[in-house]
Amino acid sequence: MNKVIVTGAQWGDEGKGRIVDLLAEAADCVVRFNGGHNAGHTLVVGGKTWKLALLPCGLLRGKLGVIGNGVVVDPQALLAEIDRIAAEGLAITPDTLAIADNATLLLPSHIALDAAQEAARAQAIGTTGRGIGPAFEDRAGRRAIRLADLADPAVLRERLAEALRYHNAVLAALGRPACELEPMLAALLEQARRILPYLRPAWKLLSEADEAGRRILFEGAQAMLLDVEHGTYPFVTSSGTGPAQAASGSGLGSAARGHALGVCKAYATRVGGGPFPTELDDAVGARLREKGGEYGTNTGRPRRCGWLDAALLRQSVRVGGMSSLALTKLDVLDGLDELRICTGYRVDGVLRDDYPAGLAERGRVAPVYETLPGWQESTRGARSLDALPEAARAYVRRIAELAGAPVSLISTGAERDDVIRLADPWMPASGG
């Protein structure tokens, strides 16, 4: 197995960066294939804390980083991140980072549109306000500017003028000021000098690496329940977030044959608006938030917390074709007398094991819980299954049963090696 795809199995913030960092040790290159700079990772490497948004985590381990065509790239944010990481001691160069030349450019006008559209909604989605959605809208509407277009000032001017005609019409309709072409063009041309050396046909680079048997790790952003088609729509991101997106978002079709590793917390969290059937607005929810440090890496927003929803997790596993699960933050549950897992829902008195797609039905959902005993012992830092209390082992087993996927990794603390390895995602499944 030379390809592993790491994606979130809940609503994001599951600790994917930590798992990617763990697996990157055995990888040759690490690929970002979706999203933008709206999702961040906090990693501790060699006792030092790093915060990344656009850059692949594998760069911190000396691996080749690739930003694929499925990512929308804000050049200002990218260069600021490169400079910040360099100031912290890690130089990012065209030898260590490749960016797909056909990736979409995120513009200041996308950020203006994001703010205007969010303010105009009757019910806010809770976007990060970084322009991700409008950039993906432009890509679908064939107005997008690709990074390769930065190389030709005349083409860039023409494409930018076309995009701004549309953007400014929408901004005017929403009562917002227009964005000016000349200042934006000047800034892009200045940024182009630094960005162009990183551009490559990423699909070709990855195809050659795959043919040579190199190990390729795909680093997903957001999560399955934020997928634009299969998530809790419309409270979702604007792109595909599942393992299948790794193929189209990188240009490496064979990514679809890799090991799909879904990352999920031992409980559930969500940032911003949208359905959350198992949300806890009580002392237990507050405890999970504080003990789990549930605040956004990029935004600092407090996360909503609740019990694990195994019904939605099972949906993520099935829709995403997930091969196994990495369970994180098990130690946050230490000290609770009992735990609850949502196994399905009642809608108008009818029991069902799938979450409704219709907005009206969602408003009538009541979660159905299974109660399990908690544990008082500490699981923090446990590095073997035998080191866990029996109740914790039973909880992990039940999650795997309900989700329909084996648990291959369990994270039990903040240190990089606080992990129980039950199976190696890089190795072929037994019998396969």
Curated annotation (Swiss-Prot):
<dbReference type="GO" id="GO:0004019">
    <property type="term" value="F:adenylosuccinate synthase activity"/>
</dbReference>
<feature type="binding site">
    <location>
        <position position="142"/>
    </location>
    <ligand>
        <name>IMP</name>
    </ligand>
</feature>
<keyword id="KW-0658">Purine biosynthesis</keyword>
<dbReference type="GO" id="GO:0046040">
    <property type="term" value="P:IMP metabolic process"/>
</dbReference>
<feature type="binding site" description="in other chain">
    <location>
        <position position="237"/>
    </location>
    <ligand>
        <name>IMP</name>
    </ligand>
</feature>
<comment type="subunit">
    <text>Homodimer.</text>
</comment>
<feature type="binding site">
    <location>
        <begin position="40"/>
        <end position="42"/>
    </location>
    <ligand>
        <name>GTP</name>
    </ligand>
</feature>
<keyword id="KW-0479">Metal-binding</keyword>
<comment type="function">
    <text>Plays an important role in the de novo pathway of purine nucleotide biosynthesis. Catalyzes the first committed step in the biosynthesis of AMP from IMP.</text>
</comment>
<comment type="pathway">
    <text>Purine metabolism; AMP biosynthesis via de novo pathway; AMP from IMP: step 1/2.</text>
</comment>
<feature type="binding site">
    <location>
        <begin position="329"/>
        <end position="331"/>
    </location>
    <ligand>
        <name>GTP</name>
    </ligand>
</feature>
<feature type="binding site">
    <location>
        <begin position="297"/>
        <end position="303"/>
    </location>
    <ligand>
        <name>substrate</name>
    </ligand>
</feature>
<comment type="similarity">
    <text>Belongs to the adenylosuccinate synthetase family.</text>
</comment>
<feature type="active site" description="Proton donor">
    <location>
        <position position="41"/>
    </location>
</feature>
<feature type="binding site" description="in other chain">
    <location>
        <begin position="38"/>
        <end position="41"/>
    </location>
    <ligand>
        <name>IMP</name>
    </ligand>
</feature>
<protein>
    <recommendedName>
        <fullName>Adenylosuccinate synthetase 1</fullName>
        <ecNumber>6.3.4.4</ecNumber>
    </recommendedName>
</protein>
<feature type="binding site">
    <location>
        <position position="13"/>
    </location>
    <ligand>
        <name>Mg(2+)</name>
    </ligand>
</feature>
<feature type="binding site">
    <location>
        <begin position="411"/>
        <end position="413"/>
    </location>
    <ligand>
        <name>GTP</name>
    </ligand>
</feature>
<feature type="binding site">
    <location>
        <position position="303"/>
    </location>
    <ligand>
        <name>GTP</name>
    </ligand>
</feature>
<feature type="binding site">
    <location>
        <position position="40"/>
    </location>
    <ligand>
        <name>Mg(2+)</name>
    </ligand>
</feature>
<feature type="binding site">
    <location>
        <begin position="12"/>
        <end position="18"/>
    </location>
    <ligand>
        <name>GTP</name>
    </ligand>
</feature>
<dbReference type="InterPro" id="IPR018220">
    <property type="entry name" value="Adenylosuccin_syn_GTP-bd"/>
</dbReference>
<feature type="binding site" description="in other chain">
    <location>
        <position position="128"/>
    </location>
    <ligand>
        <name>IMP</name>
    </ligand>
</feature>
<dbReference type="InterPro" id="IPR042109">
    <property type="entry name" value="Adenylosuccinate_synth_dom1"/>
</dbReference>
<dbReference type="InterPro" id="IPR001114">
    <property type="entry name" value="Adenylosuccinate_synthetase"/>
</dbReference>
<feature type="binding site" description="in other chain">
    <location>
        <begin position="13"/>
        <end position="16"/>
    </location>
    <ligand>
        <name>IMP</name>
    </ligand>
</feature>
<dbReference type="GO" id="GO:0005525">
    <property type="term" value="F:GTP binding"/>
</dbReference>
<keyword id="KW-0963">Cytoplasm</keyword>
<keyword id="KW-0547">Nucleotide-binding</keyword>
<feature type="binding site" description="in other chain">
    <location>
        <position position="301"/>
    </location>
    <ligand>
        <name>IMP</name>
    </ligand>
</feature>
<keyword id="KW-0436">Ligase</keyword>
<dbReference type="Pfam" id="PF00709">
    <property type="entry name" value="Adenylsucc_synt"/>
</dbReference>
<keyword id="KW-0342">GTP-binding</keyword>
<dbReference type="GO" id="GO:0000287">
    <property type="term" value="F:magnesium ion binding"/>
</dbReference>
<dbReference type="GO" id="GO:0044208">
    <property type="term" value="P:'de novo' AMP biosynthetic process"/>
</dbReference>
<dbReference type="GO" id="GO:0005737">
    <property type="term" value="C:cytoplasm"/>
</dbReference>
<dbReference type="InterPro" id="IPR042111">
    <property type="entry name" value="Adenylosuccinate_synth_dom3"/>
</dbReference>
<keyword id="KW-0460">Magnesium</keyword>
<dbReference type="InterPro" id="IPR042110">
    <property type="entry name" value="Adenylosuccinate_synth_dom2"/>
</dbReference>
<dbReference type="InterPro" id="IPR027417">
    <property type="entry name" value="P-loop_NTPase"/>
</dbReference>
<feature type="binding site" description="in other chain">
    <location>
        <position position="222"/>
    </location>
    <ligand>
        <name>IMP</name>
    </ligand>
</feature>
<feature type="active site" description="Proton acceptor">
    <location>
        <position position="13"/>
    </location>
</feature>
